[in-house]
């Protein structure tokens, strides 16, 4: 299980820094409905603008009012990556995967840094992996699955829809048979799991751990 600490080891922005960067970009977007929303919400942002929850909900609403819905993921893609997205931690994780020491990888991060490091270290031929971010992609794969349970925004190529706001996050985790919950519980109940870059403060992750304990 990979968390934000893995990505931040490679100079990825923290969650708060990402939100603040996106806030600046959204302020530059223009259309009449969005402009009206920004004017109405300006006071709330002045009072509570440093709250991750408020910023996340503001961004979700603002993008829903914009004509081009894919712009949100494209903005995240712009802010995620720099010229040197690697670290000793990521390279070591890639080598562990190379030696077939893991059955699957579950990541909560939007980025594809693990895949990039596998490719950059010349391990693509020895590690046949599949990046999975949708239910339909699970069926029939005979490769190492890398599950992006909150969506994936690769450095290059088309961007995915991601779980960004707290509202979307809670909605997904309240759906017991959502593919991401099923895959996480499968790993927690049938495999020895290692958690890297996670603070374990996420209540939904702790809930899954409690559920796995009961199931075992």
Language model features with spans:
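Conserved catalytic-core helix/loop/strand module for nucleotide-ribose chemistry
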Residues: 1-216
């Amino acid at each position: 299980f990979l968390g934000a600490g893995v990505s931040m080891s490679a100079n990825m922005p923290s969650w708060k820094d990402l939100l603040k960067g996106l806030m600046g970009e959204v302020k530059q977007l223009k259309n009449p409905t969005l402009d009206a929303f920004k004017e109405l919400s300006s006071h709330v942002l002045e009072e509570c603008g440093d709250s991750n929850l408020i910023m996340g909900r503001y961004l979700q609403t603002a993008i829903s009012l914009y004509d081009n819905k894919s712009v949100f993921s494209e903005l995240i893609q712009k802010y995620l990556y720099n010229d040197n997205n690697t670290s000793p931690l990521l390279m070591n994780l890639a080598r562990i995967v190379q030696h077939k020491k893991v059955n699957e990888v579950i990541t909560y991060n939007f980025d594809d840094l693990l895949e990039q490091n596998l490719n950059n270290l010349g391990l693509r031929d020895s590690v046949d992996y599949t990046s999975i971010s949708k239910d339909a992609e699970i069926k029939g794969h005979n490769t190492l699955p890398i599950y992006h349970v909150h969506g994936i925004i690769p450095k290059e190529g088309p961007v995915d829809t991601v779980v960004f706001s707290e509202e979307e996050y809670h909605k997904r985790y309240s759906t017991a048979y959502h593919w991401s919950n099923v895959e996480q519980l499968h790993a927690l109940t049938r495999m020895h799991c290692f958690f890297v870059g996670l603070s374990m403060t996420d209540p939904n992750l702790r809930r899954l751990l409690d559920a796995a304990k009961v199931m075992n």
